[in-house]
Design a protein with these regions (language model features):
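Catalytic cores of the polymerase beta-like nucleotidyltransferase superfamily
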Residues: 1-475
């Protein structure tokens, strides 16, 4: 493991003081997976808190805010590192926060590792001897892509089930059967979790997954799917086999999510936009739960879900509110869900006015985001991938790019100041005039300021009640 150079003399000083520093947690896991570690958390054995502070003091001021947990923070070259003592945890109450934590320098390294949630997170690395300390088989589990709890204490913290949900998706892991059974046994503990911690795990799933469907499988295997009724309603919900050979809506949604993370739009996006896209794809068919029925189509009785896009809007909003998603994210996701089938309606080519109005309708989401949701939806029907649907989606992309509306929406060219310049006094008559101007702009009546002013001159001549409020004759 290549450690940051500023850490190396600190590690030597800790050893000289009688300590045994270990890199622990996700940094070791990521390194073993061939990923660049983002965090270097250090656990120091053999020293008490005061001795740890004395050893770190020559390298700069330490932050003792985590003293009660045996944690000391040290900033080196602009990066903050956590140095912690091994600690014991005892259950004192219900929920994620019902623990008493006590630093214990005498704790063995195996005992310290046992308090971690999963074996893949319980591997330690000795940076001075360049060796792994793997007391619970985490390396073997990582090689087999298995997510397994470290010990019986796992069940004391229900948040660990949602950690399993997002870790399985982030690292393409399957849940060990005995871990799934333990999660099922504590399913009723979900209600004890603070909503902000629930959202924290969903946010990681939505932004960091390499195979998001793994997370949904974990929720299903553990019985925790029932805590998210909008998703649970998709499990077993039938679809017309001719159009959806992959199976029910839950299966379709799983395929869509896995397709999404393969798209360039998702890969090239920052985490906030990834969350929008992932949660829009997750919820794009929530409306099918309330609209699916059998009806005759093309001379045959088929499963259909008419107007499920519109029905999905309130459902995805309720889901996001329940898991604690920010309101800003919900504002993006809802219009994407409610418009994800636009490419199935109307002509194959998109008129400019259609694209302008769509971009406006999606605010604050964008056409580029909608196209990603459409493509994921389309690719989530293996082995059925009709070429004509891809062509229609690409036509929409091309039209949006030509109008420079892929990432933006039209803004009104004509503003109140233009009406004042034309001689109108500010007042309620501005509203209908400006609304009419913007509607005509979306229809393509004008595309620049000069055209907008000329259009307004004609509008005012045709609407004498508006003219009556002018301070002078129309120029």
């Amino acid at each position: 493991m290549n450690l940051p150079k500023p850490l190396l003399p600190v590690l030597s000083a800790l050893r000289a003081a009688g300590g045994r520093p270990r890199v622990v947690g996700g940094g070791v896991r990521d390194w073993l997976l061939g990923l660049e570690p983002k965090d270097f958390d250090l656990e120091v054995h053999g020293l008490d808190y005061e001795a740890l502070g004395r050893a770190l003091a020559p390298f700069g001021p330490t932050d003792l805010v985590g003293r009660s947990f045996g944690v000391m923070k040290l900033r080196l070259d602009g990066t903050e590192y956590d140095f912690s003592l091994p600690r014991r945890e005892s259950k004192t109450g219900s929920g994620h926060r019902g623990f008493a934590v006590a630093p214990d320098p005498t704790l063995s390294e195996a005992e310290a590792a046992a308090r971690r949630d999963f074996t893949i997170n319980a591997i330690a690395y000795d940076p001075l001897e360049d060796r792994l300390l793997d007391f619970h088989g985490g390396k073997a589990d990582l090689e087999k892509r298995v997510l397994r709890h470290t010990g019986p204490g796992f069940s004391e913290d229900p948040l660990r089930v949602l950690r399993a949900f997002q870790l399985a998706a982030r690292f393409d892991l399957t849940l060990a059967p005995e871990t799934a059974a333990l999660c099922r046994a504590i399913s009723d503990s979900y209600a004890e979790l603070p909503v902000e911690r629930v959202w924290g795990e969903w946010a990681k799933w939505a932004a960091k997954s390499v195979k998001p469907s793994r997370g949904l499988v974990v929720l299903k295997e553990t019985g925790w799917l029932r805590h998210f009724p909008e998703i649970a309603a998709l499990d077993g919900l039938p679809q017309e086999p001719e159009w959806h050979p992959e199976g029910d809506v839950f299966t379709h949604t799983s395929h869509c999510l896995d397709a999404l993370v393969g798209l360039a739009t998702w890969r090239d996006s920052a985490e906030p936009e990834r969350r929008i896209l992932s949660l829009a794809v997750l919820g794009h068919d929530f409306g099918k739960a309330t609209t699916t029925k059998q009806a005759e189509r093309r001379g045959k009785l088929r499963w259909v879900s008419p107007e499920h896009e519109a029905a999905g809007g309130p459902l995805v909003e309720a889901f996001l509110q329940r898991i604690g998603a920010p309101l800003e994210l919900t504002a993006h996701v809802r219009p994407l869900v409610m418009n994800h089938l636009l490419h199935h309606h109307g002509a194959a080519e998109y008129r400019d006015t259609t694209v302008r109005r769509l971009a406006r309708k999606l605010i604050p989401a964008t056409i580029d985001q909608l196209i990603a949701v459409m493509l994921a939806d389309h690719l989530g029907r293996p082995p059925l991938i009709p070429r004509e649907t891809v062509v229609r989606i690409e036509h929409l992309r091309n039209a949006a790019q030509r109008l420079a509306l892929e990432h933006d929406a039209p803004r009104p060219i004509l503003l109140g100041r233009h009406l004042i310049a034309l001689g109108l006094r500010p007042g309620p008559q501005f509203t209908p005039a400006l609304e009419a101007a913007f509607e005509s702009q979306l229809d393509g009546a004008f595309a620049d300021e000069a055209g907008a002013i000329e259009w307004m001159r004609n509008y005012l001549r045709a609407h004498p009640p508006v003219l009556s409020s002018t301070s002078s004759p129309l120029p």
